[in-house]
Amino acid sequence: MAVGVICLMGMLTACGRTSEQKVTEIRVAFNQNENHPQYRAMKAFGEKFEKETNGRYHVTIYPNGVLGEQGAMAEFIRTGALQMAIVPCSVPEGYDADFAIVGAPYLYDNIDHLEKATLNGVFDDLFASTEKYKFRVLTVYTAGERNVYAKKPINSADDLKGMIIRVNDSPTYVEMAKLMGGNGSVMAQ
């Protein structure tokens, strides 16, 4: 399973707005386009959040990686230039190696298992531990299953021997490719 995280800077309080109160902008960024479920989810979140806070907050969405690659988005959160980002687990893994477990290969049997494992509080302490890096992981999401695409059929790990396998910028994924007999090549995020 491909698993990612949603990071947030600061704490937001949903309370009413008076006419004198300033609207607070929440900037959220990710690398997917406007047709992707991440965009639709953030658009729905923004509309609901704005309504529930009586317009005190407004969510501005930056899709398509327009604010930079995913590692940069975490840095923008840390500096306050961005309030939310949707990134793969490899981004917080760059700050805390314990995040490798969240997106570890073959950890989950299926989507239901992933949801059961990630939405029941098991990772709450890990998510909260990122506050020392000036961001907080709010939740995880699934991006489907990881696949290997090749010009030849891949039926077993033997078929991967010597192949260059594109992976996220994660020591876990590079090592996974190596253990399967291939060579992990980090791709841009």
Specify the residue positions occupied by each region the protein language model found:
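Short, low-complexity disordered leader/linker segments with a strong preference
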Residues: M1-E25
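Extracytoplasmic "Venus flytrap"
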Residues: R27-A44, N64-G68
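Short, polar/charged alpha-helical segment
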Residues: N35-T60, T172-K178
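Residues at or immediately flanking beta-strands
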Residues: E25, R56-T60, I164
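Extracytoplasmic small-molecule ligand-binding "clamshell" domains
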Residues: A44, K48-E52, H58-A85, N110
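Short helix-initiation/N-cap motifs at beta->coil->alpha
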Residues: Y62-E75, N168-T172, N183-Q189
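Contiguous mixed-secondary-structure segments that line small-molecule binding/active-site clefts
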Residues: E47, Q83, P88-M187
